[in-house]
Amino acid sequence: MVKVIYKFAVFAAVNFFLMSSIVLYFNNEFLMFADRCTKDIIPSEELRYLRQVLNDSIPSKDEPLPTLKLDSLNDISGEPVIPKIIHQTWKTTEVPEGWKGAQQSCIDLHPDYEYILWTDEMSRNFIADNYPWFLPYFDAYPFNVQRADVIRYFVLYHYGGNYIDLDDGCRQRLDSLLYYPVWVRRTDPVGVSNDVMGSVPHHPYFELIIQNLEKNAKSYWLPYLTIMLSTGPLSISFLWEKYKRQLPNPPAFYDHIRVLLERDYKFSNDSYFTFYEGSSWHNNDAGIILWANRHLAYVIVAGFCLYFILSYMFFSKLLDSRYVQRFVTSKRKQPTLPLALQEDV
């Protein structure tokens, strides 16, 4: 009985230390999931009001005017700060039939915007001409979607403008988003996504992303994790966190990053974008990971149960090993000389 209690005490102490370390680490790292990040979110009411102002549609007197976060950052009567450019990427100029409607909806809604479709050849030439130090890493990516990811960061940093995935159609004009120095959209569970985003040229957030591409260019065992952590949404979400921690208090206007809520992104009458079938790069491992995310509570409970069972079995076997037993026995049976004999020695 004592032996079982001893084993369990060691097991509990080690796991308490590990769990405490993990909780403290994630509490410091994941501001993207914390309530204190709500100050970065663009309120839906603010966007609706901006669209009304830009469309010369005066809100009803009965409708309360929102308190604009933008008022303290930028005067909307002035010029927008993000250039009127739409960037998209594909392998060639021949866009798949299923995405032509989405592509055309963005072009038709923005006749006064410059439209650039970055093909694989154009992307590589752009990197070679403007950022030759990165070309070896660009060519070495094992998945083409990684190159599609990084080119959007480089062109937004270089030219500014708005990036839109080809599987995102446009429902609203983007004019009201051009008054924010950087806008990204919120997503679950990774913080922010990279399928739609906008930026002024040479913004420090995109500079930080580019600076970390070389360090993140490694394999993470599964294709889905490799893409997400090297160039995808997880990588820019972690860097979003890092960037926010480096900002002065209060930050300057051009340092700000604004976050678009899910309802303003898609699936509502006021949303900027419409949904088309996409995620063509997802493999079987992505399906497993996404299934786990949809059943996260069950996965966490099952994972903890499995972890505790296996870790207890490991500790039990370790404590029964002859090396540990020899150490414990030697400590317990170490003879103690009488005081008189100790003085003689």
From Swiss-Prot:
Please indicate if the UniProt record lists Nucleus as a keyword: no
Keyword Plastid annotated: no
Question: What are its GO biological-process terms?
Answer: mannosyl-inositol phosphorylceramide biosynthetic process
What GO CC terms are in its UniProt record?
Answer: cis-Golgi network membrane; Golgi apparatus; mannosyltransferase complex; trans-Golgi network; trans-Golgi network membrane
List the Pfam families: Gly_transf_sug
Looking at the record's lineage, which domain of life comes first? Eukaryota
| Positions bearing carbohydrate | N55, N269
Sorted alphabetically, which keywords does the UniProt record give? Glycoprotein, Glycosyltransferase, Golgi apparatus, Membrane, Transferase, Transmembrane, Transmembrane helix
List its EC numbers.
2.4.-.-
Its membrane topology is listed as: Multi-pass membrane protein
Q: Tell me a Gene Ontology molecular-function term this record carries.
A: mannosyltransferase activity
Provide the function of this protein: With imt1 and imt3, is required for the synthesis of mannosyl phosphorylinositol ceramide (MIPC). Catalyzes the addition of mannosyl to phosphorylinositol ceramide (IPC). MIPC is essential for cell morphology, cell-surface distribution of ergosterol, localization for plasma-membrane transporters, and lipid-raft-mediated endocytosis of plasma membrane proteins to the vacuole.
Output this protein's name: Inositol phosphoceramide mannosyltransferase 2
